[in-house]
């Protein structure tokens, strides 16, 4: 898929720089364990451990997560490997037993007629505040969609968001597939979605590994304040820029020479273009700058979404991250 064009990046990066300068001038200081928010984990990478074991499998995963400092998880609604977790009250009990909260889940079947009341009931029983979706699921062909499809999909989700909000759940969408596509005229779909989605009815969850496709998260967080209430964290080889490289530079931390230390460790990685998965903090992303901007973006929750061994390293880094 084509990346962010140079013109698109330059037209939007100025707003991000100005917003960050304003925050610095205002004396904003953020503490370690970024923004004072609990360190979270998405359950999807750990689904195989739950499987047919259901609540017992969930308990085993949560025990391990708590032991490394994870206090918040994002669940998956009952389906696939999570199909045994149909009783929201029982899920809540297992969570409470381990001192872990679940403010959101990725819900499947939100658009299916008749499904919404059951999904809302399940989320409410667990004590969730957000109903999330992996993708809005608009039609794309070879990575391309149409403006009409964007408008119709946004209209549908604005209506769903009004229903869920009345039931105590804020609708939110992650970005995969449809959200990471382009329009036939070459524009990125993501900013157009932000134009047509009601900012009060549908919030956003930014997938960090997508930054090389749809652009710098700092740019989005500062240009659309209050709209990004959640994020999935992965290590990203941001130093490679976007595709094509001429599109501009992403939020990259200073070079090893400027830091007076060693490099970030592994090359490539999850969301970074191949190789071993990169842990958060072992990559080239300037996470201090990302979390500074995320406060403007309205971040309430973030979840490491990586395999267990990489999650352990990412959590260790987040525990020490002092955002100032």
What are these language model-derived features?
Residues 283-294:
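A short, acidic, amphipathic alpha-helical segment used as a generic capping/interface helix at domain edges
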Residues 72, 164-279:
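Acidic/histidine-rich catalytic cores of soluble enzymes
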Residues 2-130, 226, 233, 238, ...:
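N-terminal pre-domain/capping segments
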Residues 51, 55-58, 88, 143-150, ...:
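Flexible, glycine- and charge-enriched loops at secondary-structure boundaries
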Residues 14, 21-25, 66, 94-203:
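Active-site acidic/histidine proton-transfer and metal-coordination neighborhood
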Residues 294-311:
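Substrate-binding cleft of secreted/luminal carbohydrate-active enzymes
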Residues 62, 92, 120, 161, ...:
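Short amphipathic alpha-helical segments and helix-helix/interface helices
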Residues 49, 80-84, 109-112, 138-140, ...:
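Short, small-residue-enriched loops and turns at beta-alpha junctions
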């Amino acid at each position: 898929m084509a990346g962010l064009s140079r013109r698109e990046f330059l037209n939007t990066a100025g707003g991000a720089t100005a917003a960050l300068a304003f925050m610095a001038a205002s004396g904003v200081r953020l503490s370690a364990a970024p923004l004072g928010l609990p360190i979270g984990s998405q359950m999807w990478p750990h689904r195989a451990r739950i499987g047919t074991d259901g609540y017992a499998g969930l308990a085993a995963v949560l025990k391990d997560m708590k032991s490394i400092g994870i206090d918040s998880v994002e669940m998956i609604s009952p389906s696939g490997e999570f199909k045994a977790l149909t009783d929201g009250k029982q899920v809540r009990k297992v969570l409470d037993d381990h001192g872990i909260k679940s403010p959101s889940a990725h819900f499947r079947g939100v658009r299916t007629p008749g499904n919404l009341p059951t999904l809302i009931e399940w989320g409410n029983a667990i004590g969730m505040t957000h109903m999330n979706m992996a993708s809005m699921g608009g039609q794309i062909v070879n990575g391309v969609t149409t403006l009409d499809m964007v408008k119709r999909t946004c209209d549908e989700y604005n209506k769903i968001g009004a229903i869920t909000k009345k039931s105590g759940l804020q609708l939110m969408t992650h970005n995969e597939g449809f959200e990471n596509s382009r329009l036939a005229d070459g524009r990125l779909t993501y900013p157009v979605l932000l134009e047509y989605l009601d900012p009060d009815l549908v919030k956003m969850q930014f997938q960090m590994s997508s930054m090389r496709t749809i652009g710098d998260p700092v740019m989005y967080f500062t240009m659309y304040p209050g709209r990004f209430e959640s994020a999935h964290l992965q290590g990203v080889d941001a130093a490679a820029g976007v595709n094509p490289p001429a599109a501009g530079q992403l939020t990259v931390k200073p070079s090893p020479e400027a830091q007076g230390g060693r490099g970030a460790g592994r090359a490539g990685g999850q969301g970074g273009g191949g190789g071993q998965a990169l842990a958060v903090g072992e990559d080239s992303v300037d996470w201090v700058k990302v979390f500074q901007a995320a406060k403007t973006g309205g971040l309430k929750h973030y979840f490491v979404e990586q395999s267990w061994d990489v999650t352990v390293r990412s959590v260790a880094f987040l525990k020490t991250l002092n955002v100032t």
